[in-house]
Every structure is written in structure tokens, then in C-alpha cells.
């Protein structure tokens, strides 16, 4: 894959290999749902991460009680929310990567997360992790710095009204 495209937001783009078109419909998939479905149903909650790696890291921490699934990007939609609600989910926590690097981008990113969650608040209770203290590096996932850091951020998450 072209490094320029990866560095500039193209890593989730469809690929053409020997004239064949390959794509993965991200808007219809939650990575890790097949493994974490029982824990999600038992706890009535799902934690949405951006990347598959986050779901795998959480699996190492929580094992059979892991409720983390990945949206494979920084968006989710009504289809995915309804899929979780059908499993009995009442609480959805968005745990996306830290994408703010200054006060202006912090406000923009906060508003983006808040409005994404608010859009679907009639389906479930929504909250999101937002690192106001810059504990995480820029573009780092809440799972990248260990379970203690994740749980600290989780306990300080923003609840959407």
C-alpha cells in the first residue's frame, strides 16, 4: 500500500490488486463482536474503539468479560447502534483515539464526539472518553497506555444528555 495514502487517511480505502477490487464494508461490522457478544449481552454495555488492536488489548485485560468492539474507523452509524441494542445493550461508550493536539482542535473534537453520540441517544445511553489532561499521546487510543490509564479515562468519561 502507498505510504503517502496511509499517512494521509487512506488506510481504510478499498484496494485494487491485479485489477480486482477489494473492500470491507466497515459501516456494517464491529470487529470483535463474535468473541465479545456474550460479555456485551451480560453487561448490557459496549465500548466502541476505533481500531481492532484496542479490542485485542482489552481482551488481554478482561478476557471473557471484554465488551470492547472496534468500528474500524472514527465513525459509527444507526445500523451498528441498533445491532448492539438488539443484544440488550443499554450503555454505549465511545473510546476513540485522541485526535486533539491544541485547545482549538480539542473543542472541535469534543463537539464532534458529543454530536455523534447525541444523534443516537434515543437508542441507548451514550458516553465517551475524552482526554482533557493530555494523558495520551496525539492519535493514541485510550487502550495504548495500559489498563490503569484506560480505567482512569473510562471513569472520567463524558455523559451525553
Question: Which residues does each PLM region occupy?
Answer:
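Phosphate-handling DNA/RNA-contact segment within nucleic-acid enzymes
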Residues: 1-87
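TOPRIM fold recognition
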Residues: 44, 56-161
